[in-house]
Regions:
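Helical scaffold of the NTase/Pol beta-like nucleotidyltransferase catalytic core
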Residues: 192-197, 227-252
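Active-site microenvironments that recognize anionic phosphate/pyrophosphate groups
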Residues: 1-222, 226-229, 303-305, 319-323, ...
C-alpha cells in the first residue's frame, strides 16, 4: 500500500514537471526515508492518475497508522508539506527557471511561478475550491464576495498543543524570508514547499511569492527581506512603482500603517498584488480637479464608497511626488465639521491605503484616505464597520476589502444554510442562538421578498443582501460620505493641496 502511494506521488511530480524523470529513484528513496521504510515494491502495472489530495491522504493515513504523526489537521499539514518537498527543485533552480521565463515576458514568468506554487501544494487548490464566491451589483459596480473556507480549523488538541508550545522567534513572522524551506511546528505552518523569487525594490532586497490562500487570481505578496514594520511614506510609492515596472500586468497595493484601518500584519513591511481587476479599478472619476504645480497630472475623486483620490501620468516620478504631497497634507489635516482629526492626545489618526497599477501605458495610483479615530459610540473605529453590520463583517477593512472584495468569516456558510431553512420552513431565527445576531437584518430585508422567496431563489436573495451589507461596511470606512455634504467636505481637503 505504501509503495503504491509513494509511486503515485512520484508520478505526480514527474507529470507536473516538479521532478525530472531521471530523479524517479532518488525521489522514491527520499520518501521512503520520511516513513522510516527500508523496503519498496515498484507497482507492476502503470497506475491510474488520482487527484493530489487523494494521494496525500492515503500517505497521511499510513503515517497515522504507523504512529509517525497524530491524526489532526495541523500534524497532517506539517507532514504532507515534508512529503511534497521531496518532489521539488531547490530554490536556485526555481529562480533560474523564473529568470528564463522573464526573459520571454513578465507574464510568462508569473504564469510559471503561479502554476508551480499550486502544483507544489503550497497553494492547496482542493481547499481554495471550498471557498464560496459570488458577485453583487451595487451603485459602485460589481462587488466581489467570498466566504473564506480554505484556512483549516484547528482541532482542540492542536490548539492546546500550540498553547503549550514554546513561542519561537524564528522565523520572526509568517512573512519573513526565513520561512522558505522551514519545517514548521504546531504553532507555525510548514513551508518546506515554499519558494521565493528575489527582486530589487527601491534598491533593496525584497521577495516575491504568492499567498497560500489566494483570495483572487494570482494573489501575490511582496515583502521586505528585513523584518521591519509597515510605514506609509514617500518610499512606499517608489516601491509600488518599482514593482509595477517589473510586472506591468500586476497591480500592487499596501495596507495602511495604523491599527484598525491597517491589515493583520503591521510588523513586517509588505505589499499585496495580483492579476485581477477589482471593482475599484473599474470605478470612474466622479469629480475632476487639478492641483497647483501638478497641472499635468490627471487627478480626481473616484466614485467609490471609500474616499479615494486617483492620480494618473506617464511618468511615475510625477505620481510619487504628488502622492507624497497628498500624504503629507492628509497626515496633518483636521476638519472638525467633518469629524476628521489628524491626532488626539498625540496619537496620529490619518493615513492612506495606496494601490498602484499601469493601465493603457499610463501609471495610476489610487489613494484611499483613512482615519482610525474611535469614540464611545464607535469604540472599534468611527471609519470602521459599524456595530449594526458586525453580524456579517466586524474585522478591519484592509487593502483587499478597500478594492471591493469582501473576505467574510467561515461561520457565515453554516449560519446562512440554517437561515435558509428557517425562512423556508417559517421557523423563528430566535430559536437558534447562532442566528440571533442576524434577526434585525432579516426583519429589515425579508418583507420585500415575502411573496416571492422560495427554494430556487433564496440563495441568490441572501447573497444579494450580504453584498448590500458589505457595501454599507465600505461606506462606513469612507472618511467623507458619498452624499452632497460629504463631497463638499472632501473638496475642502482637496483645496488645501
Amino acid at each position: 500500500m505504501l509503495s503504491e502511494s509513494i509511486a503515485r506521488l512520484v508520478d505526480y511530480g514527474i507529470r507536473r514537471g516538479l521532478t525530472p524523470a531521471c530523479e524517479k529513484i532518488y525521489t522514491t528513496n527520499l520518501l521512503l526515508e520520511v516513513f522510516g521504510e527500508d523496503d519498496y515494491q515498484e507497482p507492476e502495472t502503470p497506475l491510474s492518475e488520482k487527484p493530489l489530495d487523494e494521494i496525500l491522504n492515503s500517505l497521511l493515513d499510513e503515517a497515522v497508522k504507523r504512529g509517525i504523526i497524530e491524526d489532526s489537521i495541523v500534524y497532517r499539514d506539517l507532514f504532507d508539506t515534508k512529503l511534497m518537498n521531496c518532489l521539488l527543485p531547490r530554490p536556485a533552480q526555481v529562480q533560474q527557471t523564473f529568470r528564463e521565463r522573464y526573459a520571454l515576458s513578465p507574464t510568462a514568468a508569473t504564469e510559471y511561478f503561479y502554476q508551480f506554487s499550486q502544483d507544489s501544494d503550497y497553494i492547496r487548490r482542493y481547499r481554495i475550491a471550498r471557498d464560496v464566491r459570488w458577485k453583487v451589483d451595487s451603485d459602485y459596480g460589481e462587488i466581489d464576495i467570498t466566504i473564506n473556507l480554505s484556512k483549516p480549523e484547528k482541532d482542540p488538541k492542536a490548539i492546546a498543543a500550540a498553547r503549550l508550545a514554546k513561542s519561537g522567534s524564528y522565523p520572526k513572522c509568517q512573512l519573513c524570508a526565513e520561512n522558505e524551506g522551514y519545517a514548521g511546528r504546531v504553532n507555525h505552518p510548514a513551508r518546506e514547499n515554499h519558494r521565493i523569487i528575489p527582486i530589487t525594490v527601491n534598491n533593496s532586497p525584497w521577495g516575491f511569492q504568492y499567498s497560500p490562500y489566494v483570495y483572487y487570481n494570482e494573489h501575490c505578496i511582496v515583502f521586505n527581506q528585513e523584518h521591519v514594520p509597515m510605514k506609509i511614506e514617500r518610499a512606499t510609492f517608489v516601491k509600488l512603482f518599482d514593482f509595477v515596472k517589473l510586472f506591468p500586468h500586476y497591480f500592487l497595493g499596501s495596507n495602511a500603517d495604523l491599527p484598525i484601518v491597517g491589515g493583520s500584519i503591521l510588523s513586517h513591511d509588505h505589499f499585496q498584488g495580483g492579476h485581477y481587476t477589482f471593482a475599484m479599478e473599474k470605478a470612474p472619476i466622479e469629480i475632476r480637479f487639478t492641483i497647483p504645480g501638478y497641472e499635468d497630472v490627471e487627478t480626481g475623486i473616484v466614485k467609490w464608497p471609500l474616499s479615494v483620490i486617483r492620480i494618473r501620468h506617464r511618468d511615475e516620478k510625477r505620481l510619487i511626488d504628488l502622492a507624497d504631497h497628498i500624504l503629507t497634507a492628509w497626515r496633518g489635516y483636521t476638519d472638525e465639521e467633518a469629524f476628521v482629526f489628524a491626532e488626539t492626545d498625540g496619537t496620529p489618526h490619518n493615513t492612506i491605503t495606496p494601490i498602484a497599477r499601469k493601465r493603457d501605458g499610463i501609471f495610476e495610483l489610487d489613494l484611499a484616505l483613512r482615519n482610525n479615530i474611535t469614540t464611545e459610540e464607535h469604540p472599534l473605529g468611527v471609519y470602521h464597520p459599524h456595530a449594526q453590520w458586525h453580524h456579517i463583517k466586524k474585522e478591519n477593512i484592509g487593502l483587499i476589502e478597500v478594492m471591493g472584495l469582501a473576505v467574510l468569516p467561515s461561520r457565515l456558510k453554516n449560519e446562512m444554510e440554517l437561515l435558509k431553512t428557517c425562512i423556508l420552513e417559517k421557523k423563528s431565527p430566535a430559536d437558534y442562538p447562532e442566528l440571533e445576531k442576524h434577526i434585525p437584518w432579516v426583519e429589515e430585508f425579508l418583507p420585500q421578498y415575502q411573496t416571492i422567496i422560495n427554494e430556487d431563489n433564496i440563495t441568490d436573495i441572501l447573497q444579494k443582501e450580504i453584498g448590500r451589507v458589505f457595501v454599507h461596511v465600505l461606506e462606513d470606512a469612507g472618511v467623507f460620505s458619498c452624499d452632497a455634504e460629504g463631497r463638499k467636505a472632501f473638496l475642502r481637503f482637496v483645496e488645501t493641496l
